[in-house]
Amino acid sequence: AVDTSASYFNFGSLTLSGIIKSVSGYALPNASATVTYGSSGSKPSVSSDGTFAADIDSGSDTTVTASMDYNASSKAITSLDALDALKLSVGLKPSSGTADAYDFIAADFNQDGKVTSLDALDILKNSVGLSTTQSPKWVFIDGNKDYSSITKNSVIYANGVSLTDVSADATANLK
C-alpha cells in the first residue's frame, strides 16, 4: 500500500510523500514508487521503512504507482492460495472466512478479469515451482476506492492512484 500526502509550499510546488505497504500493513522497502505529473516524473528512493517523497508542481494532475519484483524463493505463494482461489472460483469463502476485493484480485492470477479454476491451477503450479504462462506479480491499487463491486466474475481495478489538480494537501492510499 502506498499512503501519500502532499504538503503545499508557497513556491508553486508540493512535496508528495508516502509509504508503500502490503494489504496487511507491512512496509515494503524493496518496492519502487513512480510519481508522474504533467509531462514530468520521478522515481523517488524508498527507505527501509517504506517511505518516499517527491516534489511535484502545484496544480498538476499526478499519478502515483508502485511496483515490486516477485521473489520466487520467498515461497510466498502456497498451495493454500491455490485452494482459496479454487474456492472463490466456485463461490465459496476462502480459508480466512470472508472474501474481499483483495482476495479476488490476488486470485485472478492470469489477470483476465475473473477468477476461475485455471487461476487456481496456475497458482498451484507456481507454488510447487512449475512454470506458468503468467508470472506472479505485485499489484498496487488505490486503497481509498470502493471495490465492493468486485466479484469472481468481475475483477476490475486500476493500478496506482490518480490525484487531479493537486494544489493543496492531498492524501491517497495505495495497497
Stretches found by the model and what they are:
Residues 8-175:
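Cellulosome-associated attachment modules in secreted, modular CAZymes
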Residues 2-5:
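Extracellular and select intracellular beta-sandwich modules with Ser/Thr-enriched
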